[in-house]
From Swiss-Prot:
It is a multi-pass membrane protein. The keyword Cell inner membrane applies. Keywords: Cell inner membrane, Cell membrane, Membrane, Transmembrane, Transmembrane helix. It comes from Rippkaea orientalis (strain PCC 8801 / RF-1) (Cyanothece sp. (strain PCC 8801)). InterPro entries: UPF0060. Belongs to the UPF0060 family. The chain crosses the membrane at residues 7-27, 36-56, 58-78, 87-107. It is found in: Cell inner membrane. This is UPF0060 membrane protein PCC8801_1733.
Amino acid sequence: MNIFRSLLYFFFTGLCEIGGGYLVWLWLKEGKSIKYALLGWGLLMLYGVLPALQTANFGRVYSAYGGAFVIFSLLWGWKVDRIPPDSYDWLGTLIILIGASVIMYAPRN
């Protein structure tokens, strides 16, 4: 699988996981309508399917996705909850993304 397609899968996986979780959070914690929860649960179901479209093995895909999840979570918090990441958040994210990239995209036999 090419890197661009793989990154797209990670992007949409992140949207489904964080967006779905956020909608369920709004329903449970902020009293939003059950419609929020239903949409959230649907997105979380897609989150369970999308990683399986990657060609790498389960452990590698989920390990690398962990890095993507970190950046998506920080960006979501910044743009949706209006809590900007600080310099340590960015440094930690950079370190994690380097590791995730090595896990997912290092040339192997």
